[in-house]
């Protein structure tokens, strides 16, 4: 259910999910992710995402975020659109404000809650933004449009 990804959750809600190894998941329309949308050629499509919560030692709340989508970016060589598949799995550790660098296990990304709350859609949007190539371009020059082909010849 995508509505679950657009709702705010308190730390107490998240801890309850972690205690029973609960999950939040669904599809989010790319058009409803404004920071991501500004980087895309087109906002058509959606991202499939799930968050699996659990409690780790010493009562630490963790989650695994899995997401898959294909976004349409603008190639910086030929200025034409191309499809960029994105698939990511991120291990998250929820920390108190200011603890992001302290004692975070190497395999986990520390997440500070906004005023003790989490908006999953925002977290998913953050991970998608990080997954987009710094300089989006077709994998091969041969796949580029006429502008790049004219520059090469």
Residue spans of the language-model regions?
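Acidic and generally charged, gly/proline-rich low-complexity regions
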Residues: 1-153
């Amino acid at each position: 259910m995508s509505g679950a990804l657009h709702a705010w959750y308190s730390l107490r809600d998240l801890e309850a999910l972690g205690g029973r190894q609960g999950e939040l998941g669904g599809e989010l329309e790319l058009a409803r992710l404004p920071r991501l949308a500004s980087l895309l050629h087109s906002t058509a499509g959606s991202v499939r995402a799930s968050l699996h919560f659990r409690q780790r030692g010493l009562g630490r709340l963790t989650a695994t975020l899995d997401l898959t989508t294909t976004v349409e970016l603008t190639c910086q060589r030929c200025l034409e659109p191309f499809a960029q598949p994105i698939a990511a799995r991120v291990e998250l550790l929820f920390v108190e404000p200011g603890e992001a660098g302290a004692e975070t296990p190497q395999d986990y990304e520390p997440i500070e809650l906004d005023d003790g709350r989490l908006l999953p859609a925002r977290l998913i949007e953050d991970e998608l933004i990080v997954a987009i190539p710094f300089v989006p371009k077709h994998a091969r020059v041969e796949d580029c449009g006429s502008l790049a082909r004219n520059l090469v010849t």
